[in-house]
């Protein structure tokens, strides 16, 4: 099957649109950057699926960042995705976490922060209290309040062929106002029957046929979803030269090197005294050229 793909579709006679995302490698790369407990892996997976589904609604170049913030053992979960479906994510946690911990046990009193950042235009940010029984319910509440559109999400995590998989579906009434609540409930009931194994193993066309073969469904071209953190040695060097040279020299005197670690992909970039001298020398040359 085609993994790491997002599919959009439309129910031609019912004024309802849908999305289906199936992820394996993109999800696995995010959770492999640290030794995350299983419940934290699941939170990252659910937020990743939700981010992918939401970025599909963007009608412009830009990005969406979803953050879970709380005062529980998990203080932060962040997923960022853009209109090209390049995604990355990280989580912060402390202490022992029970394998069966719920969303509220993990996050404590928490919030879902949704930040939409167009390439051109003003940034939008919405904050939603984590009041639903699960993450999908929190997102549904957000859509109902912010867009006044009936929306349902299904966020699924699990193992398939020995590897972690993540998948999800979204149904939303079209904003033209012609969709009926009965039609939407009919599609909800059908989608509720989808099994994890089907989402992890079947092609999108087969999943949709299994669920909606009595309805007319228009399936659009899929979009690939790709893990992309954006870190590089050059960017890390650029960060070092923003620090006072004396502070950098003190670190090298103590540690023997300056190390920068990318939380998104787990890569570390090390700079010794020769590297640092070269960085500051090049920065000085650049400043002289400007003046």
UniProtKB/Swiss-Prot annotation:
Location in the cell: Cytoplasm
Record carries keyword Cytoplasm: yes
Any one GO molecular-function label of the UniProt entry: unfolded protein binding
Keyword Chaperone applies: yes
Cysteine disulfide partners in this protein: 229-231, 262-265
Modification comment: Under oxidizing conditions two disulfide bonds are formed involving the reactive cysteines. Under reducing conditions zinc is bound to the reactive cysteines and the protein is inactive.
Entry GO terms, CC: cytoplasm
Keywords assigned by UniProt, alphabetized: Chaperone, Cytoplasm, Disulfide bond, Redox-active center, Stress response, Zinc
Record-linked CDD domains: Hsp33 (cd00498)
Biological process, per Gene Ontology: protein refolding
InterPro entries reported for this sequence: Heat_shock_Hsp33 (IPR000397), Heat_shock_Hsp33_C (IPR016154), Heat_shock_Hsp33_N (IPR016153), Hsp33_helix_hairpin_bin_dom_sf (IPR023212)
Pfam families xrefs: HSP33 (PF01430)
Coiled coil regions in record: none
Principal location class: cytoplasm
Highest taxon listed in the record's lineage: Bacteria
Role noted for this protein: Redox regulated molecular chaperone. Protects both thermally unfolding and oxidatively damaged proteins from irreversible aggregation. Plays an important role in the bacterial defense system toward oxidative stress.
Record family assignment: Belongs to the HSP33 family.
Name of this chain's protein: 33 kDa chaperonin
Annotated source species: Aliivibrio salmonicida (strain LFI1238) (Vibrio salmonicida (strain LFI1238))
Gene, per the UniProt record: hslO
């Amino acid at each position: 099957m085609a993994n790491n793909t997002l599919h959009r579709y439309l129910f031609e006679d019912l004024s309802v649109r849908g999305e289906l995302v199936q992820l394996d490698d993109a999800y696995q790369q995010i959770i492999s950057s640290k030794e995350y407990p299983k419940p934290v892996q699941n939170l990252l997976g659910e937020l990743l699926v939700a981010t992918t589904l939401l970025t599909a609604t963007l009608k412009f170049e830009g990005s969406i960042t979803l953050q879970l913030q709380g005062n529980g053992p998990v203080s932060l979960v962040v997923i960022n995705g853009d209109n090209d479906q390049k995604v990355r994510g990280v989580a912060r946690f402390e202490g022992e976490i029970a394998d069966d911990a719920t969303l509220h046990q993990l996050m404590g009193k928490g919030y879902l922060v949704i930040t939409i950042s167009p390439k051109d235009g003003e940034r939008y940010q919405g904050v939603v209290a984590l009041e639903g029984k699960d993450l999908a319910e929190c997102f549904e509440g957000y859509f109902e309040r912010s867009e006044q559109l009936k929306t349902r999400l299904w966020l699924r995590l699990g193992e398939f062929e020995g590897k972690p998989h993540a998948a999800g579906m979204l149904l939303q009434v079209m904003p033209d106002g012609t969709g009926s609540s009965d039609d939407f409930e009919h599609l909800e009931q059908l989608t509720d029957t989808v099994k994890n194994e089907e989402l992890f193993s079947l092609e999108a066309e087969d999943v949709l046929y299994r669920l909606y073969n009595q309805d007319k469904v228009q399936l659009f071209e899929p979009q690939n979803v790709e893990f992309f953190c954006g870190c590089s040695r050059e960017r890390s060097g650029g960060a070092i030269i923003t620090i006072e040279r004396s502070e950098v020299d003190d670190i090298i005197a103590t540690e023997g090197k300056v190390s920068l670690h990318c939380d998104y992909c787990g890569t570390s970039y090390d700079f010794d005294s020769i590297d640092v001298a070269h960085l500051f020398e090049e920065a000085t040359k650049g400043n002289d050229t400007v003046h």
